[in-house]
């Protein structure tokens, strides 16, 4: 009896050790693939988006050279909108938004996020460094274009970056964020769990230590603490008006993330949940209402 008990204890220890090793290895792999995303280079020109454009660039505080297109409408209203793309994409991912704004007389800044497209920087940091990049782009816009009002709209990771930037950038008149995550830890655990070929309860149990291991690895190897990548916390001290848009059919980033953000946002935060819309597809699901809500949000907050 005692021998059997020792065998079971030994098996349990070996199993736990194997699970810990698996989670550690999975965390390292998760971290490396998340920090070094495949680059999707933009085309040479923003063909068909705007009648006038020029390439621009600025140098971030850490020395990364960041690049963008500045689009100008035929008749400008004096206001500017910055558009921010999602993960593993480039500035061209916001071409549809840029066209909408240009057609309505806004100047549009379309930057590549760091470690994306033609953007400098070795790694993507999910808002930790990108928030300051947004702040510097606002500095650049004010110095170069002197716009009357500055607005911004981001999609997916771009939306999360935009919301995090509000902790350091108070000069946006209003912003629009579609399909953001509330905090990186929760969305990472959710997405890892969805990838694991095991029952849901076991997947979520395994995802937590795997994500924790990845965060620890990122902190030790790259000096980035992903526990701070949290739009829901970043907006707490902001007074910038926020329009949140989220598709109710979004399984990539569930709508509860925008609901959490809305519950913690400033009093002038509005949440639009779009029936039938999947991840960042509100424009396609409800085009007329999308145009109406987004354009009115900007014009209502212009000065």
Language model features with spans:
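Conserved alpha/beta-hydrolase "acid-adjacent" motif
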Residues: 251-257
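Hydrolase active-site cap/lid region
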Residues: 167-224, 233
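An N-terminal hydrophobic leader/cap segment in hydrolases
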Residues: 10-59
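Short beta-strand/loop motif that positions the catalytic acidic residue
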Residues: 237-239, 244-246, 250
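Alpha/beta-hydrolase active-site loop
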Residues: 93, 124-145
């Amino acid at each position: 009896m005692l021998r059997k008990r020792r065998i079971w204890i030994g098996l349990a220890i070996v199993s736990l050790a194997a699970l810990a090793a698996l989670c550690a290895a999975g965390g390292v792999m998760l971290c490396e693939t998340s920090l070094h995303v495949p680059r999707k280079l933009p085309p040479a020109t923003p063909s068909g988006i705007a009648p006038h454009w020029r390439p621009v660039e600025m140098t971030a505080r850490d020395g990364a050279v960041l690049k963008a297109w500045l689009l100008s409408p035929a008749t400008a209203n004096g206001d500017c909108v910055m558009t921010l793309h999602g993960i593993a994409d480039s500035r061209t991912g916001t071409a549809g938004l840029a066209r909408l704004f240009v057609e309505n007389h806004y100047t549009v800044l379309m930057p590549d996020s760091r470690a994306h497209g033609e953007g400098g920087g070795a790694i993507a940091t999910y808002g930790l460094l990108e928030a300051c990049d947004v702040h510097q782009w606002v500095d650049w816009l004010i110095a170069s274009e002197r716009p009357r009002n500055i607005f911004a709209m981001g999609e997916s990771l771009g939306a999360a970056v935009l919301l995090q930037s509000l902790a350091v950038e108070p000069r946006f008149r209003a912003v629009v964020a579609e399909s953001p995550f509330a905090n990186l830890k929760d969305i990472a655990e959710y997405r890892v769990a969805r990838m694991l070929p095991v029952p849901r309860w076991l997947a979520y149990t395994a995802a937590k230590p795997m994500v924790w291991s990845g965060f620890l690895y990122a902190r030790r190897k790259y000096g980035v603490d992903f526990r701070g990548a949290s739009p829901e916390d970043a907006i707490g001290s902001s007074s910038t008006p926020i329009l949140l848009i989220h598709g109710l059919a979004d399984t990539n980033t569930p709508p509860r993330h925008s609901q959490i953000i809305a519950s913690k946002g400033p009093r002038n935060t509005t949440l639009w949940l779009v029936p039938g819309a999947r991840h960042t597809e509100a424009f396609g699901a409800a085009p007329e209402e999308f145009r109406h809500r987004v354009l009115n949000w900007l014009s209502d907050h212009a000065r």
